[in-house]
Amino acid sequence: MNGTSFFGGDGTRLSHYDYDLPAAHIAQRPMEPRDHARLLVSRAQGVEDSRFDQLVEHLQAGDLLVLNDTKVIPARLLGHKPSGGRVEIFLLKPDPQHPPLWRAMTRSNKPLKVGQRVEFGEDFYAELVERQAEGHVLVALHAVGMGLDEAMQHYGQMPLPPYISGSDAQQDKSRYQTVFARRDGAVAAPTAGLHFTDALFERLAAKGVTWCHVTLHVGLGTFQPVRVEDLDAHPMHGEWRQLEADAVAKIQRTKAAGGRVVAVGTTAVRTLESSVDDQGVLQASCGETRLFIRPGYRFKVVDLMLTNFHLPKSTLLMLVAAFVGRSRLRRDYAHAMGKNYRFYSYGDTTLLYPQLEEERGLS
C-alpha cells in the first residue's frame, strides 16, 4: 500500500486516492462457482473474512437487496474493410430515435471514412454514418436474415476491462453477466452482482431477505480515468438509469419496518441516491444521472453496500470512501492485499457498513 499518497491530504485531490496494487492481485478469471468468491465484511470495529455464499449469515430478515438488472451487450465487434484492413468497433449506445444506428468508437490502422463498410461476416456489417466529437462515430448496423440482437450475440464479444487478458470469450458471455440481468444496454457488468446464484437467492428468501430491481446501464465512462487533479473540476460521466415506482414502494416499506436497504454495487447506489428529491424523498426516476459521490456526501437511502475492490484514482473508489471513510477504506484495502484477495471485475467483494459519526474525524 502506498502510504505516502493514499488518503493523504483532505481528499479533494485525485492523488489522495492512489495506491499500489501488484498485478498478481488482479483477477483474470471468474471464481467458480460464482458464490465462492471471498467476502470482506467491513465494520467500524474491524474486518471479518468470509465467503459470498455465507452472505445469508450477514443479513437479517426484513433486509432488502437492490439489484441492477442491466444486461451487458457483446459490444466489441471485430471485422475488416472490403480491402482487408482490420477494424474494431466498440458499441456505446443506440440512437434512441433510430435503433439501427449506434454511437461507437473505432480502432483501425487508418481512420474510417463516412460511408465506409466494415464486415463482421457475410450476413452482418456496419456502415459509418457520421464522425462525432470525442473520437466517437455513428454507425448503422445491418443484419441479413437475422435480427440485430441475434447478429450481435453471434459475432460480438463481451467488452471486458483492459486489465483482463487472455480470457475465454465464450465463458465470458455467461460469466460477465449477472444471473438476474434482463435489460440490454450496459458495456460493463455491475460486478458486485456477479457473485449471486439462484441457489443463494433461495437461501436468502428462506431467511426473509427480499430484493427489488433498478436499472443503470453501465457506460464506457466506468473505464475512463479521472484526468484532473482538482476533483471539483472533474466532469462526471453520465449513465442512463431507471427506478420504478414498485421498487420505491418496497424500499419505503423496508425502511418503515426497520429493515436495511442493501445496495448491490455502486451502480445501484448511484441510481438510488440520484433519485432523491430536494425534500429528501425517494422518487421514481428515469433518465441520465451524473451524480458524483465522494467524501463529504451524506447518503440518504443506502444502509449497506456490496461492492468489489476498485481501481486507484477511480470515481468508484471515491464513492466507497464516502460511504466508509478514507481511514477505514485504507485499512480494508491493506487487509485485503495482505490476505491475497482478488481485485477488480472478476475478483472478490466486500460488504460495507456505513461510516459512523465518530469515524468522520479520522478520514
From Swiss-Prot:
Q: Single GO cellular component annotation?
A: cytoplasm
UniProtKB keywords: Cytoplasm, Queuosine biosynthesis, S-adenosyl-L-methionine, Transferase
Q: Which reactions appear under catalytic activity for this entry?
A: 7-aminomethyl-7-carbaguanosine(34) in tRNA + S-adenosyl-L-methionine = epoxyqueuosine(34) in tRNA + adenine + L-methionine + 2 H(+)
- Tell me, in one coarse class, where this protein mainly resides: cytoplasm
Please name the pathway.
tRNA modification; tRNA-queuosine biosynthesis
What subcellular locations does the record give? Cytoplasm
Molecular function per GO: S-adenosylmethionine:tRNA ribosyltransferase-isomerase activity
Q: Which GO terms describe its biological process?
A: queuosine biosynthetic process; tRNA wobble guanine modification
Any Pfam family: Queuosine_synth
The source's domain of life comes to Bacteria
Q: What is its EC number?
A: 2.4.99.17
Is Transcription regulation set as a keyword in this record? Answer: no
Q: List the disulfide bonds.
A: none
- Class of the enzyme per the UniProt entry, highest EC level: transferase
Q: Check the record and name the InterPro entries matching this protein.
A: QueA, QueA_dom1, QueA_dom2, QueA_sf
Assembly and partners are described as:
Monomer.
The record's function comment reads: Transfers and isomerizes the ribose moiety from AdoMet to the 7-aminomethyl group of 7-deazaguanine (preQ1-tRNA) to give epoxyqueuosine (oQ-tRNA).
Family (UniProt):
Belongs to the QueA family.
What name does this protein carry? S-adenosylmethionine:tRNA ribosyltransferase-isomerase
